[in-house]
Amino acid sequence: DEKQLRIYYMPKALYIDPNETLRPKDHELKLPVIPVMKYNKTVKEELKEGNFTKEDLLRIYRDMSYIREFETMLNQVKTTGGYNGVAYNNPGPAHLSAGQEAAAVGMAYCLDTDDFIFGSHRSHGEILAKGLRSIQILPEDELKKVMEEFWGGATLNVAKKAYDGDDTKELGIRFLLYGAMAEIFARTTGFNKGLGGSMHTFFTPFGIYPNNAIVGGSGSIAVGAALYKKVNRKKGIVVANLGDGAMARGPVLEGMTFASMDQFNTLWE
């Protein structure tokens, strides 16, 4: 493929013709109506319309349950010093997102391993959701290779100790849950050897890129990752998971501005 290098120079003087710039037709911006809170279907309706299979919906519910229990575990460890009778002290941060499981799992359901996610300081749920989705769609031989080659199998070996079955997908789930938990608890068997912690965990084989302690920080980083994909003609999209408060932060507005400057032709559909 031909690659072109374009060099732009800042002009010393730029004449602006009022007759061209201030044309009446340019004085009006028209935006389409954006529907809000329009979804209102039951599980039975979704099944009847063929949008999901029963297995799809059960898996979605299972993933939501995993995330809720994971966050419940972290909260109990933080507030009571233990979980299910096992004493443990976690002096590190634990920014939870209990109640937002559907948003994380719904996002991940639409993605594959070529898609990237970036998050916030409350991204445990998104990490688990994307990981569970990747485990579901990856061929077993590829999943096994990912687990065996990651840190020389250090994380996998711990997960194996608590599982004597031969289901690769089930082992993958245990690998994911343990790797994320060990990272939050600053263990060397965590996904980032305990150096990322709760707010900077990532696992790139599943398309999970670092979440960010800076509120809204992923808003501009994700745009850069998307531009990388476009320039290099890589598959997939990039998702920045942010809270409503982060939408007013500088990095998010910068990301939107950058994305609208003709680097991308479509922001959303």
Language-model segments: residues:
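Cofactor-binding active-site loop characterized by glycine-rich and histidine/acidic residues
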Residues: 76, 85-267
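Conserved acidic/glycine
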Residues: 1-103, 143-145, 155-156, 163-164
